[in-house]
From Swiss-Prot:
Family recorded in the similarity comment: Belongs to the MinE family.
InterPro entries (alphabetical): MinE, MinE_sf
Gene3D superfamilies xrefs: Cell division topological specificity factor MinE
Protein function: Prevents the cell division inhibition by proteins MinC and MinD at internal division sites while permitting inhibition at polar sites. This ensures cell division at the proper site by restricting the formation of a division septum at the midpoint of the long axis of the cell.
Single Gene Ontology BP annotation: cell division
Species per Swiss-Prot/TrEMBL record: Synechococcus sp. (strain WH7803)
Protein name as catalogued: Cell division topological specificity factor
Keywords: Cell cycle, Cell division
Pfam family, one: MinE
Amino acid sequence: MTLQDLLDRILGRQPASATTARERLQLVLAHDRSDLSPELLDQMRREIFEVVAKYVDIDLEEGDVTLETEDRVTALVANLPIRRSMASSKPGS
């Protein structure tokens, strides 16, 4: 996510349709290059959420795991908003 994307999200601005189309195409290409089925990607998302949730309280509705491609390199990117760490929610800490 670029700084401009972050500002647009915070300010509630909608991306242009060309930008949305380009991002969708990049997602399709990333899926093709990674050779991951949608089912496997969904399973990975669930497991990543489960593991991270053991350590911090995350917002599952806002969280997302995606494949992103930049300069012919595909990356698995997790965007998981953290509400608080589990250590801060334990009594006596």
